[in-house]
Regions:
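Cysteine-nucleophile active-site neighborhood
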Residues: 159, 165-201
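RNA-binding accessory domains that recognize and position tRNA/RNA substrates
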Residues: 1-157, 168-172, 178-179
Length: 201
């Protein structure tokens, strides 16, 4: 985070947008110890500790941002100060996990809402408020894991299909892309596109 002081408002579970925090580290310049907000339930430090997210403070985050802007993606790790250099280098040499969607997608199918219109949602890391917003438009949602087959989604006979947003680079998700292309060859999916029903995302 490039803002110089982070955590001024604290945190409130009411505003959580996922079942957990999926980021693996938090780098900031200064962490606020005494947040001021009438809705604050806990400090940012308490929240991150509960989520097992390591925090690095006292860092010139704007300088890091300039380096990333100039050089692109760079490998980095957050480690204890006493960790031997050879162990740090071993961690830096660990191959990067490219399929971030696999870590954030729902592990199982679930439903939300009881509206008139049945919408199949492919979860690539969707935020909770998007689901709630869709459900508020008289929709009944069936949320599928990212790697669900086209056949299984179409078997649910949805009125529409929503492709959720998520982290990572789409080029790292070729299996999903190919499955969607296959999906588009299905007669029912063609029917969705040609009728008053919809597919978006």
């Amino acid at each position: 985070m490039t803002y110089p002081l982070v955590g001024n408002y604290g945190t409130n579970d009411l505003f959580n947008q996922g079942r957990k925090s999926f980021f693996q580290g938090y780098v900031i310049s200064e962490l606020c110890d005494h947040p001021s907000n009438w809705r604050c339930e806990k400090t940012l430090e308490q929240f991150l500790d509960e989520q097992d997210v390591p925090v690095l403070t006292g860092v010139d985050t704007r300088a890091i941002t300039r380096k990333l802007r100039n050089y692109g993606v760079l490998q980095g790790v957050i480690v204890p100060a006493e960790m031997p250099q050879e162990e740090v280098e071993k961690l830096l040499a660990t191959p990067e996990v490219h399929d971030q969607v696999a870590t954030v997608t729902t592990p199982e199918i679930y439903t939300l809402g009881n509206g008139k219109y049945h919408v199949a949602v492919m979860d690539f890391g969707i935020k909770q408020n998007i689901l709630e917003y869709l459900a508020s438009f008289d929709c009944h949602l069936t949320v599928f894991p990212a790697y669900t087959t086209a056949e299984e989604i179409l078997a649910a006979r949805p009125d529409g299909i929503f492709l959720a947003n998520g982290p990572g680079d789409p080029k790292d998700l070729q299996p999903i892309i190919e499955e969607l292309k296959a999906d588009r060859q299905e007669a029912y999916f063609r029917h969705l596109l040609r009728s008053s029903n919809f597919s978006f995302g």
